[in-house]
């Protein structure tokens, strides 16, 4: 089957394990979910035939993941808050604490991510406000059956998702694509492991909202 003309967002929905493949090759399936596989691969000089082959293999594997296309919008919102919002609130303060320690102790060493603490703090502050707006304004609108009237708030949330994607790019730039040096201490390595987990979670979070929750809400499901 040819997947090259399908969008990354569509593929992430229909082939759940595709998200791991997209992360492996740094393909943005959440904020950039509307671009086709071919366009995304061309931009990163990737072998489109290889990607299609990998996706074909993934599509034949049985999935144990929940099919969110079949879930109610209310169930999806409860999942987003408990699985992602609450987790981000726990993740970021600890990442900021570790980043501050790494910068303070290793500031004179090659590869030290100078500025990482400030960037993580910015993400924390922005994401805290973003999630609060979703929980207090947008999600209640959707849960009360007013999703078709939520175009304005949804547009704002999608714009803020784009901003978050750009902030992740800054994080990757500061951390050598979140790869610690060979001589990195335990805290440094734990910090980067935590950042990779946060990036995975945030991309999955944004994908679920941008490519599933928001379109379904606007259709009045």
Curated annotation (Swiss-Prot):
Entry keyword set: Cytoplasm, Iron, Metal-binding, Stress response
Gene3D superfamilies hit by this protein: nmb1532 protein domain like
One Pfam assignment: Hemerythrin
GO terms for biological process, alphabetical: protein repair; response to nitrosative stress; response to oxidative stress
Compartment(s): Cytoplasm
Keyword Metal-binding: yes
GO cellular component annotations of the record: cytoplasm
One GO MF term: metal ion binding
InterPro entries in UniProt: FeS-repair_YftE, Hemerythrin-like, RIC_family
Role of this protein: Di-iron-containing protein involved in the repair of iron-sulfur clusters damaged by oxidative and nitrosative stress conditions.
Entry's family note: Belongs to the RIC family. YtfE subfamily.
Complex and partners: Homodimer.
Protein's name according to its UniProt entry: Iron-sulfur cluster repair protein YtfE
């Amino acid at each position: 089957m040819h997947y090259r003309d399908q969008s990354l967002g569509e593929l992430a929905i229909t082939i759940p394990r595709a998200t791991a493949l997209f992360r492996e090759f740094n393909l943005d399936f959440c904020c950039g979910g509307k671009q086709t596989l071919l366009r995304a691969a061309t931009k990163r000089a990737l072998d489109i035939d290889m990607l299609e082959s990998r996706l074909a293999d993934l599509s034949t594997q049985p999935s144990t993941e929940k099919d969110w296309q079949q879930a109610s919008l209310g169930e999806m919102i409860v999942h987003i808050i408990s699985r992602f919002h609450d987790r981000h609130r726990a993740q970021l303060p600890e990442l900021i604490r570790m980043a501050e320690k790494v910068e303070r102790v290793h500031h004179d060493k090659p590869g030290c991510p100078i500025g990482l603490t400030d960037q993580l703090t910015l993400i924390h502050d922005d994401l805290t406000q973003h999630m609060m707006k979703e929980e207090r304004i947008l999600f209640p609108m959707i849960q009360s059956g007013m999703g078709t009237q939520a175009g304005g708030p949804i547009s704002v949330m999608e714009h803020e998702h784009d901003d978050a994607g750009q902030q992740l790019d800054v994080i990757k730039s500061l951390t050598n694509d979140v790869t610690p040096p060979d001589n990195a201490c335990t805290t440094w390595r734990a910090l980067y492991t935590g950042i990779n987990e946060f990036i995975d979670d945030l991309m999955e979070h944004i994908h679920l909202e941008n490519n599933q929750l928001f379109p379904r809400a606007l259709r009045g499901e």
